[in-house]
Amino acid sequence: MSIDDFKPEKWTISSNEALKLSLVSEDNAIQFSPTFTYPIFGTEEQIFGYKDLVIHLAFDAITFKPFLNVKFSSKFEGSEEELVNIKEKLLEYLPIDDTIYKDEEKWIDSFKKEQESIEAYKNDQNIDEYKIDNADFEIYKVNLQDPKMKRFHRRIQIFSLLFIEAASYIDEDDPKWEIFIVQTKKDKKFVGYATAYNYWYYPGANNFDSESKYRYRGKISQFLILPPYQGRGHGSHLYNSIVKNWRNDSSILEIVVEDPNESFDDLRDVNDLEMLYKDGFFNKLPQERPIPNAWIESTRLKYKIEKRQFSRLLEMILLSTGSNNFEYQVKQRLLIKNKDGLEGMEVSDIKDALNKSFESLREDYDRILGKCQFSNDADGPSKKKIKT
């Protein structure tokens, strides 16, 4: 070996690049790369000690039976402590007794046998069905304590680490976790899922004794459509199905989302706006300035939308309908929210700060409204110039 062969960069590869994910079905195999690998291989997302490293992590598209294989042309001849044992590292995050390593034939035989005896979800667990591009899809809601779901979730949960930033595994023994599963109706291929948790909702001291049954806050935790199915509307269908299911559940008083990223915020905003538009909400806004807090509170509870989200939606609707109340409503909220930071500033500086925040927010609201279908409808709300 030459001196160059001992340079660290010769033996280092991006773990995002090395890890190849595959969904295998009878007619094809779709390969794609993870977005994140730092939960498994560290913050640098690099693996040292192997040349031409390829990590194959494949799943049957129906059962999601996992298969793992690690290939490389040579291994660094140094201390074993310096090297990551890739097989052992990945098996920490996979169902160890359920994952087939290297023996591809055994893996294929295993998932084919499992497909023959696979047990369908119960009819009462089916909460929705929809069609995209002439293909039918179905959504099921299943408690994580269901043995079939618990085994399936152990197989798919690694995708939360690989595609959801800052995700971690949930406590599978907590009976309050529920899983919303999307799959193709014909051949039962897995499309995506969301984990959800019902938190007890404290109604306040005045109402606590009068409540006849427990009420809950429904929380969407992890939400993922697998990459091969992204960009086709599955996320909106899944989100709307969860919301519809919870709005029809009298025990759920409010719907919240745990640490949403920007793309999920957009999906949520657009679908909440579309839902409110279809319900005729845009024509029901009071004309008072400011809009009464009592009306805001009673209306958001009717739709089971959390306070911050409802405020955003209300402001976007005011902008969309050209209401002169838009600027007043937004600036009043910003003034209250930033009261401590604005204290002691000159009046002119406060106005400048509010105007800057207002314009930035309006620009973002315009961006979101532009994604809504009603913005392009001939009889949809027409945006007018807001007087400033």
Swiss-Prot record:
Species annotation: Candida glabrata (strain ATCC 2001 / BCRC 20586 / JCM 3761 / NBRC 0622 / NRRL Y-65 / CBS 138)
Compartments (UniProt record): Cytoplasm; Nucleus
Name recorded for this polypeptide: Histone acetyltransferase type B catalytic subunit
Catalysed conversion reaction: L-lysyl-[protein] + acetyl-CoA = N(6)-acetyl-L-lysyl-[protein] + CoA + H(+)
UniProt GO molecular function: chromatin binding; histone acetyltransferase activity; histone binding
E.C. designation(s): 2.3.1.48
Keyword Methyltransferase found: no
Residue ranges constituting the N-acetyltransferase domain according to the UniProt record: 142-306
Major subcellular site: cytoplasm
Positions bound to acetyl-CoA: 223-225, 230-236
GO biological process terms held by the UniProt record: double-strand break repair; subtelomeric heterochromatin formation
Family: Belongs to the HAT1 family.
Function: Catalytic component of the histone acetylase B (HAT-B) complex. Acetylates 'Lys-12' of histone H4 which is required for telomeric silencing. Has intrinsic substrate specificity that modifies lysine in recognition sequence GXGKXG. Involved in DNA double-strand break repair.
Region (Interaction with histone H4 N-terminus): 197-199
Interaction with histone H4 N-terminus, annotated site positions: 177
One GO cellular component, as annotated: chromosome, telomeric region
Catalytic residues identified in the record: 258 (proton donor/acceptor)
UniProt KW keywords: Acyltransferase, Chromatin regulator, Cytoplasm, DNA damage, DNA repair, Nucleus, Transferase
InterPro entries, sorted: Acyl_CoA_acyltransferase, GNAT_dom, Hat1_N, Hat1_N_sf, Hist_AcTrfase_B-typ_cat-su, Hist_AcTrfase_HAT1_C
Quaternary state and interactors: Component of the HAT-B complex composed of at least HAT1 and HAT2. The HAT-B complex binds to histone H4 tail.
Coiled coil: none
